Every structure is written in structure tokens, then in C-alpha cells.
């Protein structure tokens, strides 16, 4: 059985380089505005990058997990099978300004597998719309991953350009009862999602999560500069998520 871990949504709200490896899987939105590319670095650490009209929006940002009581699962990966498909259908919402919503996206599914003896693997699935994208992790059943405890994610969002951020702090005693801060992105602390950003050239971004089923919620911690990393909500015991 495949287990859906999380769907992360990056929404591009406004209208406002380097050479790429030809072998890296990539996918574009139906109108070609947004594009996503998957890569691994020299240490085999997987990453993704997002461009809009050919300009970087998210610079290469890490993907993956930190497990508890298991060998490390963060490098020595190679890109395996990858598939694409296109969907254009509709769905009906029970309330809101529009009853029928068009669901039009291109999808890229990439398998990332270890080169070592364990041969563990995971899938990352991107759905790219004209105005945003979402991605999720899936852990297929496999002998070396029958049961895992996820201590943290390695998922990152490295914002390409200087930006203003609207955010509220995460992990504080009063939880949701805060006014939004408006600061340069380099001054953001630990932040709840959604966090909204406006780049200096007018592009608006919002990073949030969706489709949480039996999984920890996500906040963001700023690692350095404009680079953020997922920070899972603590659970009971050592692991933040248990997969069986």
C-alpha cells in the first residue's frame, strides 16, 4: 500500500539561468508559465527547483526525511523511473463564489532510490497548475521500509529573490492569537503556515500544506538567508510520524 504523507502547496498569485542537466526530470504547467525540475547533487541529495517564465522562483531545495532508529535516508540517491500525465476535469465545491472548479494540471512522478545495499526508495509527485503547484511524498511498501518513525523532514523552500513576508510565529504559547508580522524575508523566525511573500518585482507566493491524513502539521523554520525548512509539529514519543 502506498502511503500519502503530505501535499505541500506553493501558490503563485501575481503576474509580474543557469544551464540544466538534460537528464533531470522536469514538468511545466499547461500554459508553460511554471516549471519544476528534480535533481540530485554530487552527494546524491535530491532537490527540486521552480521557475516562472524561465526565472527562478524557488532555487534548488532539498527533499526527503530524517528517520529515527533507522539508517540515514538523505543522500546517495539516484533518479529512477519518472512518469508524466495531464489532467483537465472539474470538481464541485459545496460553498464559495464559484460552484464548479476547473482542475487542470500536469503531473510528474519521480522515484528516488538509494545506491547503497538497502535500496530504499520514495516517490515525489508534483502537480503543476498555471498559477501554482503542489507536491507530496509517497513511501511504497518495500522490505527495508516496513515500519519507520519520521523525526523530521528535509523539505526546503529556498526563495530566489528578496521579498517581504507576512507571517505569524510558530511554537509559541498562544498559538493562533497573534497579529501578522510584516518583515523582510531574512528576518522571519519560526513561522506558521501559510506564509505569504511578495518579491521586490511584485510576484506573490504563499506556502501552505493540504491533504494532511495521519501526518504531522508543518511549520517553517528559516535556516539561513531566504531558505526555509519544514518543521513538523511534535507528537507523542520520539517520532513525529509513524508509518506502518
Locations of the language-model features?
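Boundary at the C-terminal end of the N-terminal hydrophobic targeting segment
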Residues: 19-23
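N-terminal accessory beta-strand-rich subdomains and adjacent acidic, glycine-rich linkers
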Residues: 24-244
Amino acid at each position: 500500500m502506498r502511503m500519502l504523507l503530505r501535499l505541500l502547496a506553493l501558490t503563485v498569485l501575481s503576474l509580474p539561468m543557469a544551464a540544466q542537466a538534460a537528464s533531470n526530470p522536469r514538468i511545466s504547467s499547461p500554459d508553460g508559465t511554471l516549471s519544476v525540475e528534480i535533481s540530485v547533487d554530487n552527494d546524491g541529495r535530491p532537490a527540486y527547483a521552480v521557475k516562472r517564465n524561465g526565472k527562478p522562483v524557488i532555487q534548488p531545495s532539498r527533499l526527503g526525511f530524517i528517520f529515527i532508529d533507522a539508517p540515514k535516508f538523505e543522500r546517495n540517491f539516484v533518479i529512477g523511473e519518472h512518469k508524466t500525465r495531464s489532467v483537465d476535469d472539474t470538481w464541485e465545491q459545496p460553498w464559495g463564489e464559484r460552484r464548479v472548479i476547473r482542475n487542470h494540471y500536469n503531473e510528474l512522478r519521480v522515484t528516488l532510490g538509494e545506491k547503497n545495499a538497502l535500496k530504499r526508495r520514495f516517490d515525489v509527485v508534483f502537480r503543476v497548475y498555471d498559477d501554482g503547484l503542489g507536491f507530496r511524498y509517497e513511501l511504497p511498501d518495500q522490505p527495508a521500509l516496513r515500519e519507520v518513525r519520521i523525526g523530521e523532514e528535509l523539505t526546503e523552500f529556498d526563495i530566489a529573490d528578496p521579498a517581504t513576508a507576512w507571517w505569524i510565529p510558530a511554537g509559541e504559547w498562544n498559538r493562533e492569537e497573534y497579529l501578522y508580522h510584516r518583515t523582510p524575508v531574512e528576518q522571519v523566525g519560526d513561522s506558521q503556515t501559510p506564509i505569504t511573500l511578495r518579491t521586490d518585482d511584485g510576484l506573490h507566493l504563499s506556502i501552505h500544506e493540504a491533504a494532511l491524513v495521519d501526518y504531522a502539521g508543518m511549520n517553517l523554520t528559516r535556516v539561513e538567508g531566504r531558505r526555509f525548512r519544514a518543521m513538523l509539529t511534535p507528537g507523542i514519543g520520539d517520532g513525529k510520524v509513524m508509518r506502518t
